[in-house]
């Protein structure tokens, strides 16, 4: 194996986690910028109706892309563990099985989006004036789902072995292409909503092509060889065992947010448009924090596989500290400069005022989510995904739905709606931390047994 294994299993952890997480954060931001540029371009050059149409799809986009990201998280953990343990043949089997699993998942979601968009948007009570544009946007956007699944697969593999720079470079290229195509399709071709969706789909294909090509050129056990592509039954079972709960976990948040979006849609179109603009801040801040969650899972999994229990626990606490700090700083900045941020997406002062109602509640709440998400990532790094998913279902999905139909139904104000985020994060975090403490002790016993035998 190459020496880049040392990136995760040797050296000062605080520095190494930061260096691995920084490109991940930038990569995540670029993925968010794909959708943000869609919103910004249509808001500026195609009008507020087009802005509302694109924004009203954000929950559904998050639902399905979240599932793919969760699936790739399972791939990341498995590759990292085998790579840390120097089980080269297992790494090879995981990479080639994961590529096929990812492609299948992307194709399935493609057809779900093409056929189910009208039903899902009506289920969200999407406004009649926004519905045609929203359906068109989703159907064109979902053409890029197989490519997005394959990009996330490649990103998971590179991140698992500590190389987060290549995904960043490829996303930078795709991001620049996305912005250029957005401007061309909307301003020059006057394609409005269809144009920005098409730009996103093309850009996703570009990023997937670049990262897959890079995987075929590496000189290590995680190289992608098209001749070796097959579904190894045992490996596929492990990938799905880790990835499906993680993907479902991500989807659960989006499902719960469907009820929140329905709550937003119960207000006038002005509030819907303001919410669409403000939601971009959520994505930016959350995805910056999420970089440390992926790093946490990778570092814990590799060090667990390498038999270094002392670095396993430290990886969790360092990642938690970083993600909490990022959430606090970025959330506070949004609270102070929210109007300037929202002006990037709309020139209508009434829409900005509406968006600030969300910012006012969420600004200092993001950091709370670090305790929940980083702990979930830590449990995943130890191979535990089922129980954390159950906790998320209860603490986030069920709790939020109950909140919408009780507290929000009673007050019916924007603050009463968005207050459920920090409350559900805190509740779920408490349960996740208790579970992680238990499974950590259980997982560390494997390192104590040889000493007891001596």
Regions found by a protein language model. Name each.
Residues 1-21, 79-146, 188-244, 300-365, ...:
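Short alpha-helical transmembrane segments in multi-pass integral membrane proteins
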Residues 8-45, 59-74, 78, 103-110, ...:
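N-terminal transmembrane alpha-helices
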Residues 19-38, 140, 151, 174, ...:
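Transmembrane helical elements of multi-pass membrane transporters/channels
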Residues 33-51, 121-128, 184-191, 251-284, ...:
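Helix-terminus/linker motif at the lipid-water interface of multi-pass membrane proteins
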Residues 46-59, 134, 138, 197, ...:
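Small-residue hotspots at the loop-to-helix junctions and early N-terminal turns
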Residues 51-111, 148-167, 261, 274-338, ...:
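Small-residue-rich hydrophobic transmembrane alpha-helices
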Residues 63, 178-182, 208-212, 284-287, ...:
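Hydrophobic transmembrane alpha-helices of multi-pass small-molecule transporters
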Residues 72, 141-159, 167-175, 196-211, ...:
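Short runs within selected transmembrane alpha-helices of multi-pass transporters and secretion channels
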């Amino acid at each position: 194996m190459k020496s880049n294994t040392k990136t995760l299993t040797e050296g000062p952890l605080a520095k190494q986690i930061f260096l691995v997480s920084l490109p991940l954060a930038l990569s995540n931001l670029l993925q968010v910028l794909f959708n943000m540029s869609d919103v910004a371009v249509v808001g500026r050059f195609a009008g507020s109706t087009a802005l509302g149409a694109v924004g009203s799809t954000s929950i559904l986009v998050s639902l399905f892309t979240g599932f793919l990201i969760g699936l790739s998280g399972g791939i990341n953990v498995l590759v990292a563990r085998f790579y840390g343990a120097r089980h080269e043949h297992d790494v090879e089997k995981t990479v080639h099985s994961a590529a096929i699993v990812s492609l299948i998942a992307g194709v399935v979601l493609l057809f779900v989006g093409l056929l189910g968009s009208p039903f899902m948007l009506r289920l969200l009570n999407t406004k009649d004036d926004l519905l045609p544009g929203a359906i068109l946007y989703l159907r064109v956007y979902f053409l890029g789902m197989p490519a997005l699944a394959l990009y996330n697969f490649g990103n998971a593999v590179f991140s698992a072995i500590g190389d987060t720079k290549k995904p960043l470079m490829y996303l930078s290229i795709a991001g620049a292409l996305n912005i250029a195509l957005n401007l061309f399709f909307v301003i020059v071709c006057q394609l409005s909503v269809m144009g920005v969706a098409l730009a996103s789909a093309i850009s996703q294909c570009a990023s997937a092509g670049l990262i897959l090509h890079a995987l075929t050129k590496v000189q290590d056990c995680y190289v992608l060889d098209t001749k070796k592509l097959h579904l190894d039954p045992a490996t596929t079972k492990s990938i799905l065992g880790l990835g499906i709960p993680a993907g479902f976990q991500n989807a659960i948040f989006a499902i719960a947010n469907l009820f929140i979006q329905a709550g937003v849609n119960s207000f006038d179109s002005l509030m819907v448009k303001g919410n669409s603009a403000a939601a971009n801040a959520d994505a930016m801040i959350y995805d910056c924090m999420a970089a440390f969650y992926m790093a946490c899972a990778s570092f814990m999994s590799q060090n667990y596989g390498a038999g270094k229990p002392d670095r396993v626990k430290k990886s969790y606490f360092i990642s938690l500290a970083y993600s909490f700090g990022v959430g606090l700083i970025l959330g506070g900045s949004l609270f102070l400069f929210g109007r300037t941020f929202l002006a990037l997406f709309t020139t209508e002062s009434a829409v900005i005022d509406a968006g600030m109602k969300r910012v006012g509640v969420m600004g200092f709440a993001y950091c709370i989510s670090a305790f929940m998400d980083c702990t979930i990532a830590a449990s995943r790094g130890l191979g535990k995904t089922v129980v954390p998913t159950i906790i998320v279902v209860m603490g986030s999905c069920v709790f939020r739905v109950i909140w919408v139909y009780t507290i929000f139904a009673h007050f019916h104000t924007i603050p009463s709606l968005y207050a459920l985020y920090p409350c559900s994060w805190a509740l779920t975090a408490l349960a996740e931390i208790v579970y992680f403490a238990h499974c950590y002790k259980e997982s560390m016993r494997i390192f104590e047994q040889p000493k007891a035998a001596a």
